[in-house]
């Protein structure tokens, strides 16, 4: 096999998924708290904006790299409040994270019409043309082979199905860019050490963000996977971006 990036380090492709799994297993219990602290709560607003990309909740939705379930559970609550007939599958390769999502769904009484499946984004255990929406938030950056995951997304979506991705991106404005770089590399790992007892995990986080393709480059990757009507929308000056596309 070939070497790939694990943060700024080069590792064998076959080892990368294990390394990432190990990181998320170690920080799973502090994951939600760290998201609030690192983003100063902004991730909640980003996710609220993200779910606006899924207008039809009478749908079959696959949420990949679900983590602790924030996106899927927001959709489940919205559908429940509206009386929609939603069908949700939460999928993550990390069982500890998925177990946290299960617990949250029970605590929030949102477990109806939800399935939890441990699965690899590069090899999804679903039939072709199965879902109306494929959602992934802050997850595709951690997939060893992003192109393979995009092709799997295309495969499992129904014709006219929608791909929606929320991911950290590239800040272009000068002052914000400089501040964001300083905050990412100097503050976030320190918060990770204090709160989660794991500086290394959050060093990986900021390094993986720095290496992720720009908005335009990722748009090209999505299009080359077969999608059409590929667009992105920057939030918070490009700290994150929402990418959307259709299988036509």
UniProtKB/Swiss-Prot annotation:
Keyword Methyltransferase included in the entry's annotation: yes
Q: Which InterPro entries match?
A: SAM-dependent_MTases_sf, UbiE/COQ5_MeTrFase, UbiE/COQ5_MeTrFase_CS
- SUPFAM superfamilies the record matches: S-adenosyl-L-methionine-dependent methyltransferases
Q: What is its EC number?
A: 2.1.1.163, 2.1.1.201
**Annotated S-adenosyl-L-methionine binding sites:** 68, 92, 120-121
Q: Which UniProt keywords apply?
A: Menaquinone biosynthesis, Methyltransferase, S-adenosyl-L-methionine, Transferase, Ubiquinone biosynthesis
Q: In which pathway does it act?
A: Quinol/quinone metabolism; menaquinone biosynthesis; menaquinol from 1,4-dihydroxy-2-naphthoate: step 2/2; Cofactor biosynthesis; ubiquinone biosynthesis
What this protein is reported to do is described as: Methyltransferase required for the conversion of demethylmenaquinol (DMKH2) to menaquinol (MKH2) and the conversion of 2-polyprenyl-6-methoxy-1,4-benzoquinol (DDMQH2) to 2-polyprenyl-3-methyl-6-methoxy-1,4-benzoquinol (DMQH2).
The entry sums up its family as follows: Belongs to the class I-like SAM-binding methyltransferase superfamily. MenG/UbiE family.
Q: Which PANTHER family does the annotation name?
A: 2-METHOXY-6-POLYPRENYL-1,4-BENZOQUINOL METHYLASE, MITOCHONDRIAL (PTHR43591:SF24), METHYLTRANSFERASE (PTHR43591)
Q: What is this protein called?
A: Ubiquinone/menaquinone biosynthesis C-methyltransferase UbiE
Origin organism is Rickettsia prowazekii (strain Madrid E)
Gene, per the UniProt record: ubiE
